[in-house]
């Protein structure tokens, strides 16, 4: 990689914000499973009351078209189709009176449902 390309690559912001809270919870869950090869896969699929819904799963396999992000020793994977809906989003983990859950704050969503797991663009 040329010096210019390397400089540009280091200056470009990450397409997704993966918070310390989310990475910490994923790390905790991976340690509980006892499988250090597990990575958090975030995806978008059709469905939900607003047209699209978010999904989270653990995966050991990294596909060629996956965008990979690492934070605090944890790997986040997003497939190419889902990435177009998630660019600029923040993936967080919240614990409050309503419970504990992974949350996506998506600036691309024009409508969201009350539970926050469904959206439209």
Swiss-Prot record:
Cofactor binding note from Swiss-Prot or TrEMBL: Binds 1 iron-sulfur cluster per subunit.
Signal peptide (from-to): none
Binding locations of iron-sulfur cluster: 49, 113, 115
Keywords of this entry: Iron, Iron-sulfur, Metal-binding
Highest rank taxon of the organism: Bacteria
Pfam family, one: Fe-S_biosyn
Residues annotated as transmembrane: none
Listed NCBIfam families: iron-sulfur cluster assembly accessory protein, PRK13623.1
Function: Required for insertion of 4Fe-4S clusters.
Protein name: Putative iron-sulfur cluster insertion protein ErpA
Organism name: Methylibium petroleiphilum (strain ATCC BAA-1232 / LMG 22953 / PM1)
């Amino acid at each position: 990689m040329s010096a210019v390309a390397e400089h540009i690559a280091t200056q470009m912001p990450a397409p997704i914000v993966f918070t310390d809270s989310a990475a910490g919870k994923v790390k905790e869950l991976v340690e509980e499973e006892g499988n250090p090869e597990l990575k958090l896969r975030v995806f978008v699929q059709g469905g939900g009351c607003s047209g699209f819904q978010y999904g989270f799963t653990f995966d050991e396999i990294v596909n060629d078209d996956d965008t990979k992000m690492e934070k605090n020793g944890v790997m986040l994977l997003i497939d190419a189709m889902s990435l177009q809906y998630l660019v600029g989003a923040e993936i967080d983990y919240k614990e409050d009176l309503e419970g504990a859950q992974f949350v996506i704050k998506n600036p691309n969503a024009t409508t969201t449902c009350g539970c926050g797991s469904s959206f439209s663009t």
